[in-house]
Amino acid sequence: TWAISNAMVDAGMKPEDVDGMLSYSGNDSTHAPWVAGDLGIRLNFYMDVHGGGSSTEALIGIAMGVIEAGMCKTVAIYRAMNGYSAVRIGGTGARSAVPITGDQIHHRAYGWQSAGQMFAPTFLRHMYDYGTTPEQVAGVKVAHSKHASNNPKAYYKKRYTIDDVINSRIIFKPLHLLDCCVETDNATCIIVTRTERARDCIHPPAVIQSVVGLSLIHI
């Protein structure tokens, strides 16, 4: 609720201006109807999709679709997660581990726990098919660190080079330590609405020009 409230204030919106909510499940989700009730928001549409990682970008595409379809006018995309202090991927000991349910019984029980482990085969396949190099993959971290250095709210503001990433230790071949993201406690919200409505908000709008999707095959 804190993230959504702040996002509405930042945009100059009130609870009655928001009529859609989207989020994604990740072991500790709070579903939209409960969040909306706490904020005084009346929903015409909500969805909690299964996923993680890039689900936020996918939800932006879904928000565009439901707005274009006339199902709602303004969508709050939110997620709050105690990714460090509470549920940890593959966690043991003092911090609880992610529970094993559903299709996870086919891989979690055999040690396939984290996002790094799950995506490493995809990187290897991409390298095999297209000749992608570790240096090209490292460029993602370099770009992210540049953006973080300009973000006052970023956890880590140090800029990294290609060599820094390549020389960090291997976590899951071909991914290095600096290729992997940091588990953090966080809450965030993105508000998506029509361009004409966004122009009336406090800040200049960020225009979403397009979205793209893919079908992921690990091996």
Role assignments for model-derived ranges:
Residues 24-78, 82-118, 156-182, 214:
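Conserved catalytic cysteine-centered active-site region
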Residues 4, 32, 123:
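Generic structural marker for isolated residues within well-ordered, non-membrane alpha-helices
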